[in-house]
Amino acid sequence: MKKLKKLFAVMLSLVMVLAMGITSFADTNSATITLTGFSEADKVEYMQIIQKDETKSSGWAFANNAGACFTEAFGLVDSDDTQQQVIWGLIQYQDKNVKLPNGVTAEEATAAKIDLALSKVAALTGFSKATNKESIEVNAAGVYAIKAEETGFTYKTATAYVGFGEPYPTLTNAAVTAKKSPTSVDKTVADEDHVVAIGDIVTYTIEAYVPFIDAANTKDRTFTITDKITGADYYLTGPNSVSSVTMEGKDDQVGTINVNDDGKGFTIDLNSLVADTDNPNAGKKITVTYTAKVKEITVENKAGSHAAGVDYGADNEPVKLFTGELVLLKYGDGNVNNSLANAEFVLYKDGEEAPLTFVKENNGKYKYAPNTEDASATLVTDKNGMIDVEGLDVGSYHFEETKAPKGYSINTDGKTLTLTVDGEVATANLYNEGGLNDTKLSALPATGGIGTTIFTIVGCGIMIAAAGLFFASRRKENR
């Protein structure tokens, strides 16, 4: 019995070697492993991997085929002897001052070897499903492997050590905290109401997390972040541009945004962050910030990631941006059914001195086109008396008439229309419409008619007749 107690005392140093938790005294024949951070898991499973065995030099032995996983991870040929060497190595890993009994050899343990072994253990059959995600009840001393699954997260296989207390063979309780990394990829845009104008430069942010990749996976240690965009062009260089890939705890850039050949997406290679099987970066947040220039009336953007052969973010909702549309109806004589074609306007945004410029599309609409060479400020009503402009941001806009249709006068009042968001965030393109009446030209006094001509002719006739009578009477007198 003394020998056994000595062995058990030595094994107490194994506590915490494999992420073992705080222990407390339990009932003689049972112990509780308290679980922290597992409550949201879809499934929690556990299995004993080291058990008491007085026939072994350490007093412990691997259980449920876990020994082969450890010897393989430690680079040893599997046998009872090599398994004992691994167990003694685990003891010394925790306490370098432990003195080994004569004739005992310990295989050096490292964090990488332990993680590799546990990743192999996780693939074994024989795990039991925990009915309670906050605690597990066990009735034997030893080391227990605990694994979990949760949509949107990867879990590192955890271990808990249930030891012996006083009086022997009282079992001690244990506690273990989950170590998990989100696989989610979150996308946001700086424009809070999600309404922009064509030509605007908008800033996007992607947040993702370095995944935990099993140490056993040495061939496919990959991690990339991807992005797809429609309705805008990536704007990574130039005034007010942003292109940044950072990781928490590190000042320098950890990656570069590489735009695809078609310009509709990009990829960021972050393989270097997961190359180490020790997973030192697992769970650290990656922040990608970049700018894009709006070119269409709607913009759709979606991010994802790829880690160890698995794609994440496929179910993410894309981030959408919208623009506004204004429609003006030009009519005459107070009758909205009397639409007027060929009226000309310019459009001003409230607070700006220069009129906005547009390009006319094949569908007859005018698309906002700032700083575009072939754009024009002139807007002309179509055969239906309509002007339809799109690609505008929220705000008030004023239509100023510059040329009235033939036979009508300019309405100097113009028309002001406003684009507003219904709620905090737009869910569709904004729209507003209004009409503007023109009146016919007023009648002016006629010119170029007979006027006084008839009177002039009559007067001249009278004068000629009078002159004739005068000369006739003179001639008569002379006779």
Region locations from a protein language model:
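Solvent-exposed loop/turn and edge beta-strand elements of beta-rich ligand-binding domains
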Residues: 2-479
